[in-house]
């Protein structure tokens, strides 16, 4: 039976969606095992804001978190709050916003490309995002800056919708405005993205300035006001703003030089190297084995880029609309950003979506060129990516899962809760050097006031603060034969034997061990039981 193009399109859309959702949901919360220090701090602040209306530094509903001392983007924390309210403090809960945004991005990229090309190219773009290692990996854990990938897509989607129904421009402004709270590095480029996209539409007579566009502009300006205030506060031009409903904090250390025009040639070279090698030194971002988009894909990207340049040149010369211009604006401004910062995969996350879209356009072009000579060229290319995807998935859930658990300290959540359950009133829990303090405190119930009153820093002031003690936790501390509870990472069999000879009972949670002296009358009702 011959299926119509419409039915084939729907069937392929469903299959790609199932593939993409499955890759993001399978063993969600378990792989990557453990918790990264950034997602831990974001979750810690979400819990504090949810229950006490302020973060660990005492700021009520800040537009930017103080966190490590040099700050952290806040939107991810606010998105975690309703899920924490519903499901409690668990690693899989912290990762829900990123996973959901990742899945919604599959819908968004297909819809965006379908508006500027045909359905085959749009499904190719969706497919590449669905099976691509970069996007699968970022969707499965909660690094706050990676939210910007989805919000920039949503902003563009509703911008394109706005050409047909102008009220959508307002929704586009909302998502572009929210992107400012996903990742501070995009602050310089998002207003320029909106400006260039708007000027282009006016240039090709695709829109006129109406009340909806004015409202959209004002909406975006409202989102930028806290950002401007934040900059003025941290440049010591204004005092910090603290109210019961909203705060603009003065950071302990303001990294104003993170985005700068210094060393542009070196930064551009680093960006090119990142895109060509498809990896950085961060195992949670990419792997040497599979890269970001599978190693052979960049050939298609270059082709797609050339196709777009040709179409955009014609569009500008004839003053006729072509949606490829939007992709080029976003891509070129991401390149500009890459020349202003020291890149790694997540710092330049705003570039990868457009690389994949150019890749889809390039593949579509090759299929059109060779379809008559090789009728099954589309099947061959699809099979090539599916084989790579299956290989990546096997690697991700076996070798990668084992390796990443060493970085994220798999077992840390149950280990901390167990240690709390074994602790007597007033007793301290000692933590070894291998952990970041946020990985521990995220599973504690230390209130913001208790945190401020008890925290002792080892390097204050600094961009990345470290602490020696907070409430009942003592960090950088190891067993010396005394009674107590200790959290240690990666004990060898020899280590275990030595500690057991000293009288410690050892309870193992994957990579994390809890050591305790045998004591009588241990507490029966525990945080471990409450959380579980």
Enumerate the predicted regions with their spans.
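Transmembrane catalytic cores of multi-pass membrane glycosyltransferases
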Residues: 221-270
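Membrane-proximal, lumen/periplasm-facing interface regions of secretory-pathway glyco-
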Residues: 65, 375-423, 433-448, 452-468, ...
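Aromatic/acidic, Gly/Pro-rich catalytic loop(s) in extracytoplasmic/lumenal soluble domains
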Residues: 455-532
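Membrane-integral, polyisoprenol-dependent glycosyltransferases
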Residues: 2-236, 270-367
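Short extracytoplasmic/periplasmic juxtamembrane "stem" segments immediately C-terminal to an N-terminal membrane anchor
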Residues: 42-49, 246-251, 406-419
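Short, well-ordered alpha-helical microsegments
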Residues: 359, 437-438, 494-496
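Short hydrophobic beta-strand segments
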Residues: 422-434, 482-489
């Amino acid at each position: 039976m011959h299926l119509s193009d419409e039915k084939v399109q729907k069937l392929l859309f469903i299959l790609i969606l199932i593939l993409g959702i499955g890759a993001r949901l399978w063993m969600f919360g378990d792989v990557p095992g453990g918790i990264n220090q950034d997602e831990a701090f974001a979750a810690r602040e979400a819990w504090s804001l949810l229950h006490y209306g302020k973060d660990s530094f005492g700021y009520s509903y800040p537009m930017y978190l103080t966190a490590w001392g040099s700050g952290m983007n806040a939107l991810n924390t606010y998105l975690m709050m309703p899920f924490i309210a519903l499901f409690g403090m668990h690693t899989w809960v912290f990762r829900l916003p990123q996973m959901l945004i990742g899945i919604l991005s599959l819908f968004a990229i297909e819809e965006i490309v379908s508006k500027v090309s045909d359905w085959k190219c749009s499904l190719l773009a969706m497919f590449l995002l669905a099976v691509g290692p970069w996007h699968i990996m970022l969707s499965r854990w909660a690094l706050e800056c990676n939210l910007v990938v989805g919000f920039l897509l949503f902003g563009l989607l509703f911008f394109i919708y706005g050409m047909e129904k102008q009220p959508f421009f307002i929704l586009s402004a909302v998502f572009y405005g929210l992107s400012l709270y996903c990742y501070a590095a995009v602050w310089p480029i998002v207003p320029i993205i909106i400006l260039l996209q708007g000027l282009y539409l006016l240039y090709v007579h695709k829109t006129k300035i109406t009340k909806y566009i004015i409202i959209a502009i004002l909406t975006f300006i409202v989102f930028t006001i806290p950002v401007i205030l934040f900059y003025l506060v941290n440049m010591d031009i204004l005092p910090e703003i603290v109210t019961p409903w909203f705060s603009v904090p003065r950071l302990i250390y303001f990294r104003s030089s993170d985005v700068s025009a210094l060393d542009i040639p070196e930064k551009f070279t680093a960006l090119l190297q990142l895109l060509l090698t498809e990896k950085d030194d961060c195992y949670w971002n990419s792997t040497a084995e599979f890269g970001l988009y599978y190693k052979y894909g960049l050939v298609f990207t270059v082709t797609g880029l050339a196709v777009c340049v040709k179409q955009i040149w014609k569009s500008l010369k004839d003053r006729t609309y072509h949606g490829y211009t939007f992709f080029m604006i976003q891509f070129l401004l991401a390149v500009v950003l890459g020349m202003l910062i020291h890149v790694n995969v997540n710092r330049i996350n705003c570039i990868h979506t457009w690389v994949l879209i150019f890749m889809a356009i390039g593949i579509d072009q090759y299929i059109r060129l060779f379809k008559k000579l090789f009728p099954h060229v589309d099947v061959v290319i699809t099979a090539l990516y599916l084989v790579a995807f299956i290989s990546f998935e096997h690697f991700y859930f076996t070798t990668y899962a084992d390796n990443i658990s060493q970085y994220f300290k798999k077992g840390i959540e149950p280990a901390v809760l167990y240690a709390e359950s074994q602790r007597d009133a007033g007793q301290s829990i000692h933590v070894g050097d291998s952990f970041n303090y946020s990985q521990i405190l995220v599973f504690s119930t230390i209130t913001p006031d208790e945190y401020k009153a008890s925290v002792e820093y080892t390097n204050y002031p600094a961009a990345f603060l470290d602490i020696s003690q907070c409430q009942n936790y003592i960090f950088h501390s190891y067993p010396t034969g005394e009674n107590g509870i200790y959290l240690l990472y990666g004990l060898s069999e020899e280590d275990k034997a030595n500690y057991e000879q000293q009288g410690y009972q050892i309870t193992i949670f994957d990579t994390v061990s809890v050591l305790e002296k045998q004591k009588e009358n241990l507490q029966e009702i525990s945080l471990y039981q409450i959380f579980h």
